[in-house]
């Protein structure tokens, strides 16, 4: 099927419509830990451009006083908390609690008051208290960054939709260890689960929300 035929099929199915954004967004940075942003780790890749783009977006969000939430994958040394995922992807065993690969990439400049959620599954919702964190902070929209596009970003995008959170995914702020799955999953995310936008568009949305709320930008 050609690209034009694919476009026609998706248009006929009315996929890829835009979601209505709310007025209380948060930024969710999924698994931008050293284990995914440093190619020295078996699970990692050089995501320098994506990390730098995300840092810029985070700084805009911080200036607007938006909630910023990080997630990281980590397992106990005995790996008994890893379930079937470690059998399917044994490289994840390098991500052990207390080790450097679980640390949030320091280039993102995480602040002490910014929440870190430890997770053991693909979705940021699976087995975590993310739902209660979002409810307690009255969040109604998510701007999602992180890695990997084909794994935890996609899984979290699906759950965000199912939990009722309109979501923006800035394309410059998500990455994968290979380009083909990255592009394919961005295509699917845009078609079915969230709005894939530019980092500039995401920043403009944050600034518009801040102006309406009276926060500094």
Please place each PLM-identified region on the residue numbering.
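Short acidic-hydrophobic, aromatic-tinged amphipathic segments that line or gate anion-handling sites
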Residues: 117, 194-204
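Active-site-proximal loop->helix
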Residues: 177-190
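Internal catalytic-core helix/loop-beta-alpha segment
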Residues: 98-146
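Short glycine/serine/threonine-rich phosphate/pyrophosphate-binding segments
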Residues: 149-156
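Glycine-centered short loops/turns at secondary-structure junctions
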Residues: 63-66, 138, 164
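A short glycine-rich beta-strand->turn/loop micro-motif centered on a GG-aromatic cluster
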Residues: 143-146, 164-179
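Active-site acidic carboxylates
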Residues: 1-111, 205-217
């Amino acid at each position: 099927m050609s690209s034009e035929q694919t476009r026609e099929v998706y248009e006929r199915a009315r996929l890829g419509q835009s979601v209505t954004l709310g007025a209380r967004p948060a930024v969710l940075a999924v698994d931008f830990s050293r284990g995914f942003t440093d190619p020295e780790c078996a699970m990692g890749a050089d995501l320098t451009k994506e990390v730098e783009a995300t840092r810029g977006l985070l700084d805009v969000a911080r200036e607007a006083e938006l909630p910023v939430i990080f997630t990281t994958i980590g397992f106990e040394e005995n790996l008994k908390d890893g379930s079937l995922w470690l059998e399917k992807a044994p490289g994840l065993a390098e991500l052990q609690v207390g080790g450097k690969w679980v640390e949030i990439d320091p280039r993102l400049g995480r602040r002490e008051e910014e929440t870190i959620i430890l997770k053991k599954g693909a979705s940021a919702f699976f087995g975590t208290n993310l739902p209660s964190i979002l409810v307690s902070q009255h969040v109604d929209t998510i701007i999602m960054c992180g890695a990997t596009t084909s794994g935890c970003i996609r899984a979290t995008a699906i759950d965000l939709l199912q939990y009722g959170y309109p979501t923006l995914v800035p394309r410059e702020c998500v990455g994968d260890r290979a380009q083909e799955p990255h592009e394919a999953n961005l295509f699917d995310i845009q078609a079915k689960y969230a709005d894939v936008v530019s980092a500039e568009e995401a920043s403009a949305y944050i600034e518009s929300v801040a102006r309406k709320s009276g926060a500094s930008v």
